[in-house]
């Protein structure tokens, strides 16, 4: 199986399955001298771990991380950083009766067509549990970016038909982790919670939208043509399971605008070139403008629902009916928030190292003033 490595100058390779012994990540390209502890990574993993509220799966996992290599006396060494999280609460018996059944909306059929076999327990490699490895890698990326004044924050802006009002970065920081749906608009959060509860009570699920905002990214990050910053962000976010669309800045709404509405006029602010508005989402021509980078990921409803659905037995070819049991998220949107943060952080740190804005050898050699 290929496609398990992400990035160029700062690379992560994830491994593990939902019901295997554990999952983890190997990071290559992190500079030496970055202060890093298991607590740094654990803080990020705790944001996505299951069983924290009624809107997530009730699978109980502590998701305790172990750093196996690449860190000595609290500092990265410049060698590969390996991290492992062991599974503790897998219940594979719930999948035994559907081991040969293609679950609608899942990767089962595609895996069988490509590989001729699959780990049917909890989706195996295609499970959303794989994203904990991305969050662990993103934790290191975020720690490195923080030395350069770059922060990445995400929040839920829609669940089902409930939309949040626009939020400032201060509101996002202050409110997102105060509610189980990870919404910065606390009044909308209550309505979103009701939307998720209604879907669960109807043996159904619901999707939504996560918005990610990166601040402090200097102008000049990204390259023209195929490795445009926005192209890389879209690629990274589309790689998250369940994401079906990505927007940058005004996104799809820009198709209905005139140029006079869409264009962000330039101005100077504290001696630096800025734009009066930010409909471009902080990126023009594939290169950052110095304004906040804003992107959104649309996430489909969780495909695991307990309603009867038509499907096919992949062993016999016979049509059949499936009713999925087990522990599943009625909405994966809230737990996608830290995953989206991680993927955006990984893109930005990779591009900043590639572009010479972060020292690729030593994190101690930081001249952060050049990037602010």
UniProtKB/Swiss-Prot annotation:
EC numbers: 4.2.3.5
Cofactor note: Reduced FMN (FMNH(2)).
Chain residues that bind FMN: 125-127, 285, 300-304, 327
MF GO annotations: chorismate synthase activity; FMN binding
Binding positions (NADP(+)): 48
Reaction catalysis annotation: 5-O-(1-carboxyvinyl)-3-phosphoshikimate = chorismate + phosphate
Superkingdom of the organism of origin: Archaea
InterPro entries for the chain: Chorismate_synth, Chorismate_synth_AroC_sf, Chorismate_synthase_CS
SUPFAM superfamilies registered for this protein in UniProt: Chorismate synthase, AroC
Keywords carried by this UniProt record: Amino-acid biosynthesis, Aromatic amino acid biosynthesis, FAD, Flavoprotein, FMN, Lyase, NADP
CDD domains: Chorismate_synthase (cd07304)
Required co-factors: FMNH2
Entry GO terms, CC: cytosol
Coiled coil spans: none
Pathway it works in: Metabolic intermediate biosynthesis; chorismate biosynthesis; chorismate from D-erythrose 4-phosphate and phosphoenolpyruvate: step 7/7
One Pfam family, short name: Chorismate_synt
Biological process terms in GO annotation: amino acid biosynthetic process; aromatic amino acid family biosynthetic process; chorismate biosynthetic process
Matching NCBIfam families: aroC, PRK05382.1
Similarity-based family: Belongs to the chorismate synthase family.
Function, as annotated: This reaction introduces a second double bond into the aromatic ring system.
Protein name per UniProt: Chorismate synthase
Source organism of the structure: Methanocella arvoryzae (strain DSM 22066 / NBRC 105507 / MRE50)
Gene it is expressed from: aroC
């Amino acid at each position: 199986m290929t496609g398990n490595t992400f990035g160029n100058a700062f690379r992560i390779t994830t491994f593990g399955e939902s019901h295997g012994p554990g999952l983890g990540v190997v990071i290559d390209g992190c500079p030496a001298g970055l202060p890093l502890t298991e607590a740094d990574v654990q803080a990020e993993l705790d944001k996505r771990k299951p069983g924290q509220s009624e809107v997530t799966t009730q699978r109980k996992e502590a998701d305790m991380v172990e750093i196996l290599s690449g860190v000595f006396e609290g500092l990265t060494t410049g060698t590969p950083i390996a991290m492992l999280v062991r599974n503790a609460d897998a219940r594979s018996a719930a999948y035994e009766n559907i081991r040969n059944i293609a679950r609608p909306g899942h990767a089962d059929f595609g895996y069988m067509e490509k590989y001729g076999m699959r780990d049917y327990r909890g989706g195996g490699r295609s499970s959303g549990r794989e994203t904990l490895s991305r969050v662990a890698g993103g934790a290191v990326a975020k720690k490195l970016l923080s030395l350069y004044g770059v922060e990445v924050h995400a929040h839920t802006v829609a669940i089902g038909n409930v939309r949040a009002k626009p939020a400032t970065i201060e509101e996002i920081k202050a409110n997102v982790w105060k509610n189980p749906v990870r919404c910065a608009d606390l009044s909308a959060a209550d309505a979103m919670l009701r939307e998720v509860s209604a879907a669960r009570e109807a043996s159904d699920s619901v999707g939504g939208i996560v918005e990610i905002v990166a601040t402090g990214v200097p102008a000049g990050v990204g390259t023209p043509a195929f490795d445009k910053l926005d192209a890389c962000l879209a690629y990274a976010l589309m790689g998250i399971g369940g994401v079906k669309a990505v927007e940058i800045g005004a996104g799809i709404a820009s198709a209905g605008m005139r140029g006079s509405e869409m264009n962000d006029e330039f101005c100077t602010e504290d001696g630096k070139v800025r734009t009066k508005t930010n409909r471009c989402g902080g990126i023009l021509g594939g290169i950052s403008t110095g304004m906040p980078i804003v992107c959104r990921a649309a996430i489909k409803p969780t495909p695991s629902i307990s309603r009867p659905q038509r499907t096919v037995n992949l062993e016999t070819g016979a049509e059949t009916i499936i009713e999925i049991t087990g522990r599943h998220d009625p909405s994966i949107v809230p737990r996608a928030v830290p995953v989206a943060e991680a993927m955006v952080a990984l893109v930005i740190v990779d591009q900043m190292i590639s572009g010479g804005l972060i020292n690729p050898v030593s994190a101690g050699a930081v001249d952060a003033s050049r990037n602010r």
